[in-house]
Amino acid sequence: MPTSIKAIKESLEAVTSLLDPLFQELATDTRSGVQKALKSRQKAIQADLAEEERLEAMLSYEKALYKEGYQAIAGIDEVGRGPLAGPVVAACVILPQHCKIKGLNDSKKIPKAKHETIYQAVKEKALAIGIGIIDNQLIDEVNIYEATKLAMLEAIKQLEGQLTQPDYLLIDAMTLDIAISQQSILKGDANSLSIAAASIVAKVTRDQMMANYDRIFPGYGFAKNAGYGTKEHLQELKAYGITPIHRKSFEPVKSMCCDSTNP
């Protein structure tokens, strides 16, 4: 067994089980540096085990469908139903069977600093990805609920021509008029790994779009607020008026449009 604290730390990094004999051997080492390293590694392993258990639980819908004979399960989710500006974006993602991506969760639960890393991990592992984007003008024409459906259908359509085609859809709280077997799951982005994958793809895609809009329409804070009605956003609306990407069917934008047409 290594004796220097540095060597012990290196040995601990290779340990992946809480039952590893090295833990018992080091338990009698009275050096504070060793005990600190020991506890740190045990804590890290416990966190990894908890994450593995969480990811396994989020595959429950997929595993049941694999047993029924389905091969390519697509998760579908959207981002951007609530903002005052910008599009609604949906993603359709097919992951390999039993695929687990550390940290993948409902995009609202993932720290923003980790969005890009997990997004890239999904892109690398996914068998197929489709993205549907419905702009603010069509949202105003058909309403946000119907626009969300259109975005999801477009995301599925984007899979055409890719090697893997979905034979089952897991959808976050929505039912689609399409000839593919499907299941609507309430809070699906927190309960299905496939839907969670779609959630982060849609989130990062939309955030990138809003960052671009921030450069085109500076002053509204689109890169920061993503078009949502924050206090600062509402203040800028009052000061500068609406932009071409604001949703005229959403309040208070709707009232501002009406006010501007009245003498």
From Swiss-Prot:
Keywords associated with the record: Cytoplasm, Endonuclease, Hydrolase, Manganese, Metal-binding, Nuclease
Protein's name in the database: Ribonuclease HII
HAMAP family: RNase_HII_B
Assigned EC number: 3.1.26.4
Transmembrane residue ranges: none
Cofactor requirement: Mn(2+); Mg(2+)
InterPro entries: RNase_HII, RNase_HII/HIII, RNase_HII/HIII_dom, RNaseH-like_sf, RNaseH_sf
Organism classification: Bacteria, Bacillati, Bacillota, Bacilli, Lactobacillales
Keyword presence, 4Fe-4S: no
Organism (species): Streptococcus pyogenes serotype M3 (strain ATCC BAA-595 / MGAS315)
Gene for this chain: rnhB
